């Protein structure tokens, strides 16, 4: 929806704390870890995060949280509940992927299995699967 998109401001250098708050509002430990890691990586040019904002509030975010070996590992695509399904998040993801590709990075999106169809509709191709292991 063009009117919705025009009401939003894209920020390619949002405050790390605001992005962390949006992604992990109820998980302070995870939020603090994310904030610390993002600040450290961005200061060395190893990560980027973009947001869409309305009236100063983040309504959507996506990031490339590891830039290495010619690949940009994208993750944390998140849109506020009220605007999901309106194409806002998908458009931001595609814009960031295209910008990274124009700079010579190969965008790679890591996602949970239930989100594969969403990213395939955006033009991503499933290349493989990763497993995550946690120490118990």
Residue ranges and their predicted role:
Residues 27-78:
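A conserved beta-strand-loop-helix scaffold within acyl/acetyltransferase catalytic domains
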Residues 1-40:
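Short amphipathic alpha-helix that is part of the acyltransferase structural core
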Residues 1-7, 111, 131-135:
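Acyl-donor-binding surface of acyltransferase catalytic domains
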Residues 75, 79, 85-102, 121:
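Conserved acetyl-CoA-binding loop-helix of GNAT-fold acetyltransferases
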Residues 70, 105-106, 125:
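Short acidic/polar active-site loop segments enriched in Thr and Asp
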Residues 100-112:
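Conserved GNAT acetyl-CoA-binding A-motif
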Residues 90, 113-130, 136:
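Conserved active-site alpha-helix within GNAT-family acetyltransferase domains
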